[in-house]
A protein has these predicted regions:
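N-terminal accessory segments that position/regulate proteins before the catalytic core
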Residues: 1-65, 88, 98, 106, ...
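Glycine/small-residue-rich phosphate/adenosyl-binding loop
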Residues: 2, 86-165
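Glycine-rich phosphate/pyrophosphate-binding beta-alpha loops
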Residues: 71-78
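Short, basic and Ser/Thr-rich N-terminal targeting/leader segments
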Residues: 78-81, 134-136, 205
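A glycine-rich helix N-cap at a beta->alpha junction
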Residues: 104-113, 199-222
C-alpha cells in the first residue's frame, strides 16, 4: 500500500497549538534487526525471578537509571501515572518485611488465599517468609497515581493507570536484567501498609514491590517452561 495518508499527523492545526519534533530513528538492515532481536531475546529468556539475594551493595545510580528507563514507557495521555520509591534503609526494609509477613501469614496460614491459588503457587514453593525484603540491598515500590493533585489542591484525572504502570514495570524489570541485576515482582495482599511506611499521599496506591540486587551465588530457581510461540502468537 502506498504511503499516502488522507489525515496526516500531526495536522497543521495541531502543530500550531502544541510543540512537535522530528522522531529520531535509525533504520537497520534486516540482518542487523534479526541479530539485535535475537540477542535481546536470548538475554531476556535468561531472566528469572529471584527470591534469594546477595547483600552486596548496588550503586544508587543503577536504580536511578532503571527508573529513568521505566519512565520512558508509554502511558495513557502521557500522564506517566507512577511514582517509584526506592529505599536501602535497614529500618524501613525491616518494617516492610514485618508488615508483609503479617499479611502473608493470613494469606498462607489462615487460608485467605483460596485453594486454587495455593495450588497454582505450589511449584514455586512460596510461603509467608519474606527474608529477601531485608537482605536485598534495595526495595523499590511502584505506586500507581489514581489521580493527580495540583498546586491549588484540585485534582486531575489519570487514564489507563494500571495498564500504564504495568508497562513501566516491565521496562523496569528489563532494565535491571540488562544491567546484570535480579528482582522479583512481589505483591503482598493487601499492600496498603506501604503507603504508611513510605509516607505516600492518598492519591497513590501500591502497584508492585521489587526487591533488587545481585542473585545469591548458587541460587536455584524453579525449572519452569515458558509457553511456545504458537501458544501465544496467532497470525491472521
Amino acid at each position: 500500500m502506498a504511503e499516502h495518508y488522507e489525515h496526516p499527523y500531526p495536522s497543521s492545526e495541531l502543530e500550531s497549538q502544541y510543540p512537535f519534533v522530528h522522531y529520531e530513528h535509525e533504520r537497520f538492515t534486516e540482518e542487523e534487526m534479526r541479530n539485535r532481536a535475537h540477542d535481546f531475546y536470548e538475554q531476556m529468556e535468561r531472566r528469572r525471578s529471584v527470591r534469594m539475594f546477595s547483600s552486596d551493595p548496588v550503586p544508587k545510580s543503577l536504580i536511578e537509571t532503571a527508573v529513568k528507563t521505566a519512565s520512558t514507557a508509554p502511558s495513557g495521555a502521557h500522564k506517566q501515572p507512577w511514582t517509584f520509591v526506592a529505599t536501602q534503609n535497614p529500618e524501613i526494609k525491616h518494617a516492610i518485611r514485618v508488615a508483609a509477613e503479617k499479611e502473608e501469614e493470613i494469606n498462607y496460614l489462615e487460608n485467605r488465599m483460596n485453594k486454587e491459588w495455593q495450588e497454582a503457587l505450589a511449584p514455586l514453593g512460596t510461603d509467608h517468609h519474606k527474608e529477601f525484603l531485608e537482605i536485598a540491598p534495595w526495595i523499590v515500590v511502584l505506586f500507581e497515581q489514581r489521580y493527580e493533585t495540583n498546586v491549588d489542591e484540585s485534582t486531575s484525572k489519570n487514564y489507563y493507570v494500571k495498564e500504564s504502570c504495568g508497562i513501566a514495570a516491565g521496562f523496569f524489570i528489563a532494565a535491571l536484567h540488562h544491567m546484570g541485576l535480579a528482582t522479583l515482582t512481589h505483591t503482598p495482599t493487601p499492600m496498603n501498609f506501604l503507603n504508611e511506611i513510605l509516607d505516600r499521599p492518598k492519591n497513590e496506591r501500591p502497584f508492585v514491590l521489587f526487591p533488587v540486587g545481585y542473585p545469591l551465588k548458587g541460587v536455584k530457581v524453579p525449572d519452569l517452561k515458558r509457553k511456545d510461540l504458537d501458544e501465544v502468537l496467532f497470525s491472521c
